C-alpha cells in the first residue's frame, strides 16, 4: 500500500465521521420539531422519526460501504496490474538472457567455423605442397633402375681383364655423374628444409627445384648414356684393352675398385634415404588426407546445423515478439477496462446521488402523508361524535313524531334525510381514508424492513470501518517507522558529509604543508 492510498483512507474516515456527526445533528434537530401527538398514537410517530433518521444514516453508510468496496476493487486491480508488470519484467529478463545466450553460442560457432576454414585452407596448402613433392619424387624414382643397370655393368666390367683401361677412360664421366648425384642429394635436403617456409615461398621453391632437377638430370642422363655407349664399344676393343691391362700394375686396379665400391655404397645410402623420405611423405599425405576429410565432415555438419539453428532462433524471436505484442495488448485492454470501470464508478456515484435525492423526497412525502393521516383521524373522531349526536337527535325526533305529527316533523325528517346523506358521504370518505391508511401502513412496514436491513449493513460497515482504522493505524505506525529510518539515514548521511568535509580540509592542509 502506497502513501497515496493511506491518505485516501484517512480522507474517507474523516468524511465518514463528518457524515455521522451531520446525521446525529439532523436527528437532534428533527426530534424537537415533531408536533404534539395524541395519547393513543404517541408510539407510532416516534418510531417513524427514529426510522427516518436510521434510514438516512443507513443511506449514508450504504454510500460509504459502496465507496469502500470500490476502493477495495481498485486496490485489488492495482495489485493485479503490479503482479502482471512484475511477471512481464521477469519474462523480459528471461528473453534477454536467452538472446544473450544465443548470441554467445552463435559467436562461438562462428569462431569455430572460421578456425575450421582457416585450418582447412592451411591443410589444402600443405596437401598441394605434398602433391608437388610427390611429383618430384616420382620423377626421381626413374633414377634407381638406371643406377642398378650401371652397377651391373660395372660389376661385369670388373670381372673382365680389359676393364682397367676402360675405367681409366671413363673415370671422369663417372666422377661427373657422382657429382650430379651429390647435387641431387643437396637439393633434396634443401627441399626438405624449405617446407617450413610460407606457402608462396614453398610454391616458388618447388617450381625452381623441379626446374633445376630437370636441368641437372639431363647431363646426368647424358653421362649415363656416354657410359653405356662406352660399355657397348667395349665389345669391339676388348682384345686391345686386354693386352694393355696386362701391362698395368695391380695396385691401380685395387684402388679404383675400392673407389667404385665407395661410390656404390654412397648411392645405396642415398637410395635408402630417398625411400625412407618417400614412405614418410606418403604417411604424412595419408594423415593430411584423413585430417582433411575429418575437417570436411565437420564443416558439412556445421553447414547443415546452421539453418536449423537459424530457424530455431527465428522461431524463438517470433515467439518473443508475439508475447510482447500480447503483453502490450493486455496492457491496453487493462487500461481500457480501467477507464470503463472508472466510468461505471462515476455512473454509480451519479445513480447513488439520484437515489439519495429520491429517498429524501420520499421521506418528505411520507411526513406529509403522516400529517394528513393524523388530520383525517381527528376529522374521523369529530365526525363520529357528530354522528352520535345526530343519532340521539334522530331518536328524539322519532319519539316526538310518534307523539305528534306536525309540519315541524316533516321539516325534521327532511333535515334527517339530508344529515343521513351527509353521513353516507362522510362514511364513503372515511372508507377512502382507511384504504389510504392501510396503504401507508404497508409502506411503513416495508420501510421498517428496509431500515432493519440498513441497520445490519451499518453494523457491518462499522466493523469494516474499525478494521480500516486498525489497518490505518498500523500503516501510520509503519509510515512513522519508515520516516524515522529515513531521518536516521539522513542524519548519518549528514555526519558522513561532515566527516568527508573535515577529511578534505585536513588533506588540503597536508597538501599545503
Swiss-Prot record:
One of its GO terms (biological process) is centriole-centriole cohesion. GO terms for molecular function: protein serine/threonine kinase binding. Residues 1-217 are annotated as: Required for centriolar localization and for interaction with CEP250, CROCC, LRRC45 and NEK2. It is found in: Cytoplasm, Cytoskeleton, Microtubule organizing center, Centrosome, Centriole. Interacts (via N-terminus) with centriolar protein CEP250/CNAP1; the interaction results in recruitment of CCDC102B to the proximal ends of centrioles. Interacts (via N-terminus) with CROCC/rootletin and LRRC45. Interacts (via N-terminus) with serine/threonine-protein kinase NEK2; the interaction results in phosphorylation of CCDC102B. Phosphorylated directly or indirectly by NEK2 during mitosis which causes dissociation of CCDC102B from the centrosome and allows for centrosome separation. Changing residue 401 to A: Substantial decrease in phosphorylation. During interphase, forms fibers at the proximal ends of centrioles to maintain centrosome cohesion. During mitosis, dissociates from the centrosome following phosphorylation to allow centrosome separation. Contributes to CROCC/rootletin filament formation. Residues 493-513 are annotated as: Disordered. One of its GO terms (cellular component) is cytoplasm. Keywords: Coiled coil, Cytoplasm, Cytoskeleton, Phosphoprotein. This is Coiled-coil domain-containing protein 102B. Changing residue 21 to A: Substantial decrease in phosphorylation. Residues 72-142, 268-337, 363-513 form a coiled coil. The keyword Transmembrane helix does not apply. The modification Phosphoserine is found at residues 21-22, 34, 135, 142, 194, 210, 401, 404, 406. It comes from Homo sapiens.
